[in-house]
Amino acid sequence: MKEYKVWAYARSAASNLPALENQLAEVMREADRRGYIIVNSCMEQKYGTEFWRPDLFAMLTAVQQGRVNAVMVQSLDRLSHDITILYRILRFLQNYGVALITTETNLQYELYLTGLESRILARTARTGKRVPWEVAVDAD
């Protein structure tokens, strides 16, 4: 099993700070349960349609610098609600060989529903880079 160095990320546009803190805590608990190394974490109260988010860019910088090899979120929409932004983030993760891991949803199914799975798979075939998601296999 691959050793993941994870950046735990939480985002919500709602002004309910305890709910956002709980979202991040749940992601971190799941990372710990799976035996991942939590390198850093962040949470931000921003809209999912915004691309220029300070904590998102801090996480992407960590990816670029090789400090993490996985990003862990509750679900795909925690990264963005905008398909174009999601595709940019996924391409970025793929370029750096970083896995995206979700804790509460089937990421591959979410990508299929948004139409992004086929785009990423086509890009994978063209570039030879691995897919930027992790298919979790639970022993439970």
Please tell me what each predicted stretch does.
Residues M1-D140:
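Short, structured surface patches at the beginning of a domain
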